[in-house]
Structures are given as structure tokens and as C-alpha cells.
């Protein structure tokens, strides 16, 4: 199968990878968690062990460093936070144009749910997954699932 036989999404996915991800306290800039792993791989459930103190923060700054061989007209993410398979929150992020053969860093701020909606870490631990769909416009590039453990 040659590169002409691949769909647009498959072609982008083949040359796309996450190099690292960093979570910071949005108020102080202090690094809470960092992982040098490609969380975009679709055929495996990834795991992330994040400090429990993240649940007490007003907002978290997420930094994703990624590389792509193919250009993307409108790179965007749809994220769903699921508790035992049920959607608790959904977020939409848009980066826009990404050049071919580039490495990029994308920073976004995620605000915490109201305190009245928060659940204790012992209830959340291992029961929360983040499902991320990566798109170029409406073309799905890849979909990944990360299960969260609070340490």
C-alpha cells in the first residue's frame, strides 16, 4: 500500500507524534507533571500518574509538544473526561494552521470544575479516562485514551 492509498487522516497520523506533555499550576507556573511519551497512539489505553494536588488547583496549564510531517490547515482537539465511561466534561481546543515538517508547542489553560462538582481522589482514581480526538478541520487524525491515577 503506497502513500497515495492512505486516507488524509491516516497520512497525517503516520507522521504525527506527541514528544512530551507538561501540566503546570496555571497560577504559579510550577510543573506538576511531565511525561515524555507519545499519548497519541490510538491502539492502546495509556496511563498517567498525576499528583493528587492537581485536583485542588484553580486551573492547569497544559503544554503539548508535537511533531508532524504533514501540514494541517486547522489542528484541533476534542477532549472528553469520562468517569466510569460517562462523560463528566468536554473541552474543545483549536490551534489552527501547523506547517509541514515542524515541531510545535501548544499551551492551553483548563479551569477546574466548581468545587461543588468535585469528587474525592479515592473515588476518581483509576475510574477517569480522558478521550482525546485529534483533528485537522473535520478529518480525524487519531483518537487516544488516557486513564488517570492520582498519586
Curated annotation (Swiss-Prot):
Predominant location: nucleus
Keyword annotations from UniProtKB, A to Z: cGMP, Cytoplasm, Nucleus
Subcellular location(s) per record: Nucleus; Cytoplasm
A biological process from GO: sensory perception of light stimulus
Origin: domain of life: Eukaryota
Family membership: Belongs to the PDE6D/unc-119 family.
Protein name (record): Probable cGMP 3',5'-cyclic phosphodiesterase subunit delta
Gene this chain is encoded by: PrBP
